[in-house]
Curated annotation (Swiss-Prot):
Metal-binding in keyword set: yes
Single annotated GO MF: tRNA-guanosine(34) queuine transglycosylase activity
Gene behind the chain: tgt
Quaternary structure note: Homodimer. Within each dimer, one monomer is responsible for RNA recognition and catalysis, while the other monomer binds to the replacement base PreQ1.
This protein's name: Queuine tRNA-ribosyltransferase
Gene Ontology biological process terms, A to Z: queuosine biosynthetic process; tRNA wobble guanine modification; tRNA-guanine transglycosylation
Residues that bind substrate: 92-96, 146, 190, 217
Residues annotated as the enzyme's active site: 92 (proton acceptor), 267 (nucleophile)
Protein family (similarity comment): Belongs to the queuine tRNA-ribosyltransferase family.
Gene3D superfamilies the UniProt entry points to: Queuine tRNA-ribosyltransferase-like
Residue ranges of the region described as RNA binding: 248-254, 272-276
Length: 376
């Protein structure tokens, strides 16, 4: 039996308010998961990540397998001890990273052979290997090994990719069970932007049986309206009593639209990566701190924000100076602000669903940006 329990508490339209319960902690949903690719959310301490409101983080199976390697992580008793995060961790399977290698990989029925981006060595990764790696990592949510369908892709290419992912899903399920791993195992719905393929994938995954269902292949360059159309299509096709996870999608607008279409979990490097590039998220849009207009701006990133960067009195002028001088403090403060913004956005979304006012919240979210909400 999986160590995950999921409770769907209430709905407001298609928006869902729930709770994930693990032995290592509880996660209120909808939830945003900060990404710790190498076992660290870049630039800040685990205690700071927790203080910002995050209850679960994501680790990268592919990169951790290559560096530092499983033996070293096993010496620490698993990924939690290694990175000093005592809450739940979700690990991806490595499929998306293999997809991103493009010309340096070869896909067969057995799995993927690729040149390591760290030293060029030949590496093989398949469903069984991915499940073994994630067992050593001792993550709380394990993702099946799949092939991320590219965009654009013809229906034939998307079909063959989806069917391969389904065969790998069954092998992942078998390997996970044979290892005696009680971590939750999530299936991943593929099929590109073809509704019939998405339906077939969702049905086949439910026949195999998983603890949750992720929606993959919707962070690969497809237009927003096509992504939303796929979420609209899948909402009634996925089981209501299992969590839904939209992989790698992470603009604030994407989170709001995903929640409006029944998604419970999100992850993205955007808040941390953008912070390192001087892009700070606010309720009225993005502050691009490198712009000259902020050279003598005495306001914090967002007046009224409760993050340490804003309450600490650090001005946009100062942050621009730090960024231009490549000072480490700039991305640290930016990351603290961006993740605070993301976690507060999710908390506000949860409160709106509980109050039955999510649609009004959605309208005000866009109005603050001078925009109009897309049709539902």
């Amino acid at each position: 039996m999986s160590r995950l329990q999921f409770q769907l508490q209430t709905r407001d339209g298609r928006a869902r308010r729930g709770r994930l319960t693990f032995p290592r902690g509880t996660v209120e949903t909808p939830a945003f998961m900060p990404v710790g690719t190498y076992g660290s959310v870049k630039g800040i301490l685990p205690d700071q990540v927790r203080a910002l409101g995050a209850e679960i983080i994501l680790g990268n199976t592919f990169h951790l397998y290559l560096r530092p390697g499983l033996d070293i992580i096993a010496d620490h008793g698993g990924l939690h001890g290694f990175c000093r995060w005592d809450g739940p961790i979700l690990t991806d399977s490595g499929g998306f990273q293999v997809f991103s290698l493009a010309h340096r990989r070869k896909i067969t029925e057995q799995g993927v052979t690729f040149a390591s981006p760290t030293d060029g060595a030949r590496v093989f990764l398949g469903p069984e290997e991915s499940m073994k790696i994630q067992k050593v990592l001792d993550s709380d949510v394990v993702m099946i090994f799949d092939e991320c369908t590219p965009y654009p892709a013809t229906e034939d290419v998307a079909r063959r990719s989806m069917e391969l992912s389904l065969r790998w899903a069954q092998r992942s399920r078998n390997a996970h069970d044979e290892l005696g791993n009680d971590a939750a195992l999530f299936g991943i719905v593929q099929g590109g932007v073809h509704t019939d393929l998405r339906s077939r994938s969702a049905d086949a995954l439910q026949a195999i049986g998983f603890d949750g269902y992720a929606i993959g292949g919707l962070a690969v360059g497809e237009p927003e309206d096509e992504r939303n159309a796929m979420l609209d299509h899948l909402d009634p096709e996925l089981p209501a009593d299992r969590p839904r996870y939209l992989m790698g999608v992470g603009r604030p607008e994407d989170l709001v639209e995903g929640v409006a279409r029944g998604v419970d979990m999100f992850d993205c490097v955007m808040p941390t990566r953008n912070a390192r590039n001087g892009h700070y998220f606010t309720s009225f849009g993005t502050v691009r701190i490198r712009n000259s207009q902020y050279a003598r701006d005495m306001d914090p990133i967002e007046p009224g924000c409760g993050c340490v960067a804003c309450t600490g009195g650090y001005t946009r002028s100062y942050l621009r100076h730090l960024d231009r001088c490549n000072e480490m403090l700039a991305p640290m403060l930016g990351t603290l602000h961006n993740l605070f913004y993301y976690e507060k956005l999710m908390a506000d979304i949860r409160a709106a669903i509980e109050a039955g006012t999510f649609l009004a919240f959605r309208e005000s979210f866009y109005a603050a940006r001078g925009a109009v909400a897309p049709p539902l």
